[in-house]
Amino acid sequence: GGGVAGTSCAYHLAKYGWKNVVLLERDQLTSGTTWHAAGLIGQLGATSTITKLRKYSLDLYKELEKTTGLSTGLKQNGAITVASSKDRMQELLRQATTAQLSNVEVEVLNKARIKELYSVLKNDDLVGGVYMPKDGQADPVGVTNVLAKAAKMLGVQIFEKSPVKKILVKNKRICGVETSQGKIDCEYVVLATGMWSRQIG
């Protein structure tokens, strides 16, 4: 699939030494669900692994803009997450501590600071919140195009208008894929086809 997931997989496989990586897209890059995504980039996660992955993604987008000369449309305008209960605030504090351990910039907020940062927000029933100044948004199409170009720079071949008709199996192992353009022999397949996955048998 030629969305953000597929291009990211292709880029990272090539980056970490995999050879002969091929990305097949049924239509054009970003023509699936990626095109509809909001592109929000928040670093605060429920676990340290998710937080690290989100920070990595943000840093990667900035790095690949320089590498490829293309824009992801990244705007780091910050994000506030608020809590209206003590339990929710405790969860935000836990996540904020985890984020700080991963070198993510985060500020714990009281009601007054929330009002200062976002004056139109009614804060009467709030306990507090957290502010992530480096969070923001990017253009999902831009991110995909940046990842695709970076992948190509590492030797990945990308074929658009090449829908996969079926995954070929021999002796209970994947041995290739059949596309509209012909057969490709391979040992491994990464399915990044979103809601079209069921069509591949």
Q: Across the structure, where does each feature detected by a protein language model lie?
A:
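Glycine-rich Rossmann-fold phosphate-binding loop(s) that bind the pyrophosphate
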Residues: 1-3, 26, 193
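N-terminal Rossmann-fold NAD(P) dinucleotide-binding loop
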Residues: 6-7
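Gly/Ala-rich phosphate-binding loop of Rossmann-like dinucleotide-binding domains
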Residues: 10, 14, 150
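Glycine-rich FAD pyrophosphate-binding loop
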Residues: 14-35
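Short loop/edge segments at beta-strand edges and connector loops
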Residues: 25, 110, 160-162
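Dinucleotide-binding Rossmann-like beta1-alpha1 core, especially the glycine-rich loop
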Residues: 38-117
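A short, glycine/Asx- and small/polar-enriched loop/turn
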Residues: 87-90, 118-126, 168-175, 184
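Helical element adjacent to the flavin cofactor pocket in flavoenzyme catalytic cores
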Residues: 130-188, 192-199
